[in-house]
Amino acid sequence: VTGLLLDTNVISMFAPTKVVQNKAFADWLEERETHEGVFLSAVTIHEIVKGAELLRARGATAKAKLVDAFLQELMTHYEDRILALDAEAGVEAGRLEAKAVAAGSAPGAADAMIAGIASRHALTIVTLNLKHFQAFDVPLMSPEEILP
């Protein structure tokens, strides 16, 4: 497996609750999907569900329903390109997170798991938060780097 692993914040750029969506980046991403692999992680699914449930808990049920529908579209679109945290990715995530913590960083388990999945599958993480992933020493790119 080679290609790109989209971080949750990149997928969130296209959520129906966002006011501004980046059409140029969406076009770039669509082109990548035809020529190389573009993947999501199960961690991203978790984070989106968590976000929807927190909206619901705060009484923002209409917004939560939009996020639910968005999630269903994502899961259909990326159906066989949603990568799980299997045992090998879990081991890699643990190693990467421990190395980052030992170096004085506090990356968080979700980002460590995304990095572990990316490392396990030799993918480049596309993220808006490069800083969150730099301690993991995995290939990264930002939408801002990709487009002028």
Regions found by a protein language model. Give the residues of each.
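Short, flexible helix/strand-to-coil boundary loops that buttress conserved ligand/catalytic motifs
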Residues: 15-18, 52, 97, 137
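Active-site neighborhoods of divalent-metal-dependent phosphate/nucleic-acid chemistry enzymes
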Residues: 2-3, 50-55, 76-126
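Acidic active-site catalytic centers that drive phospho-/nucleotidyl reactions
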Residues: 7-9, 47, 111, 129
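A generic structural signal for short hydrophobic patches within well-formed alpha-helices
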Residues: 11, 45-48, 90, 133
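Conserved beta-strand scaffold positions in the cores of enzyme catalytic domains, especially
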Residues: 38, 82-84, 140
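Helix N-cap/beta->alpha junction signal
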Residues: 41-42, 86, 129
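Acidic, PIN/NYN-like endoribonuclease modules and their adjacent C-terminal/linker elements
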Residues: 3, 115-148
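Short, well-structured N-terminal submotif of metal-dependent ribonuclease cores
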Residues: 1-43, 54-73, 147-148
